[in-house]
């Protein structure tokens, strides 16, 4: 609450996604990833992004060794923005495979390597890229 008004809400959403991922892992072990609904596949991808992009930290990288609260907050917002945009695209009929292949996912993952003095500008850039790629995806699929 000292960092941002929505910190606890974002944190709780991420924790929920990780818990749901653990439950879905049991299904995947029994019948495979293809048995999951597109929404559940997106949930698995979002949880993977939380684990790999947000929670994983490289202690030997000069920028990633220390992560400010502002950067953590922005990273939470980016991961969840991708998840929300993906859910919206699915509701509009987009294909899950196209959603998870959006190039912006790599940019979200690289955000943790952003220098502190460039956080705001890079956050805006990635947010605009997510909006543009999602709009293009929906336009391309005629949705």
Where are these regions (language model features)?
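Conserved catalytic/coupling modules of large nucleotide/cofactor-utilizing molecular machines
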Residues: 1-143
């Amino acid at each position: 609450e000292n960092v941002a008004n929505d910190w606890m809400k974002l944190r709780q959403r991420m924790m929920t996604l990780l818990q749901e991922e653990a439950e879905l892992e049991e299904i995947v072990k029994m019948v495979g990833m293809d048995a999951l609904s597109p929404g559940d596949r997106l949930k698995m991808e979002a949880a993977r992004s939380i684990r790999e992009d947000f929670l994983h930290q490289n202690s030997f990288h000069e920028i990633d060794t220390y992560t400010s609260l502002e950067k953590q907050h922005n990273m939470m917002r980016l991961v969840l923005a991708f998840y929300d945009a993906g859910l919206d695209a699915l509701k509009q009929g987009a294909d899950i495979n196209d959603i998870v292949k959006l190039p912006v996912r790599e940019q979200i993952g690289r955000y943790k390597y952003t220098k502190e003095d460039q956080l705001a500008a890079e956050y805006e850039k990635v947010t605009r890229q997510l909006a543009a790629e999602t709009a293009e995806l929906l336009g391309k699929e005629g949705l």
